[in-house]
Amino acid sequence: MHTAARTLSSTRSSPLQRHRMALLALLLAGSALLLAGCASTRPPPGVTAVTPFDVQRYQGHWYELARLDHAFERGMTDVSATYTAQADGSVRVVNRGYAPASGQWREAVGKAQFTGAPTTASLKVSFFGPFYGGYHVAALDPDYRWALVVGPTTGYAWILAREKHIAPAQQNAIVAQARALGVDTAALIWVTHERQDPAH
């Protein structure tokens, strides 16, 4: 045991240790690049954020009708988002959804800030301290009844609406707009809304 301790604490590393350190450095570098890509706050190529945009009209409760799959919402049903404009110009974000695997409602609270003028629907959102990701309203109903949102890439996309369901013709039109922007609409997950959220 003492010999092993001295070996681990030695300033001279073995070839195996050097190999492991090099592998760790590569993994860390790859992770940093991945985080940098995910943390982009600019609209992806081909996507233009809606302008003019009125955050006072946009705030309030939205239901998530469809999304592309990603780890932080995987398996969730009855997903909703509530946006509240703050006095400092930021937007409070509360995302909620039901996790069938655990039988529990889950909630994530974040903060969104405009990346430029508040009349352009391009924001950065954070749920994890200093790490931000892009949130861009790419299409919006004139009456603010539905919205198509794209993240830092077109691999992140959501269709939101004020109601749990919208007319099929309207749904098809939104999907067509998403497809034109480069979103893989065949991969969209349509969210079920069968439960009453106790928070609403």
What are these regions (language model features)?
Residues A4-L26:
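Bacterial N-terminal signal peptides that target proteins for export
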Residues H2-A5, L24, L34-H200:
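A beta-rich soluble binding module of mature secreted/lumenal proteins
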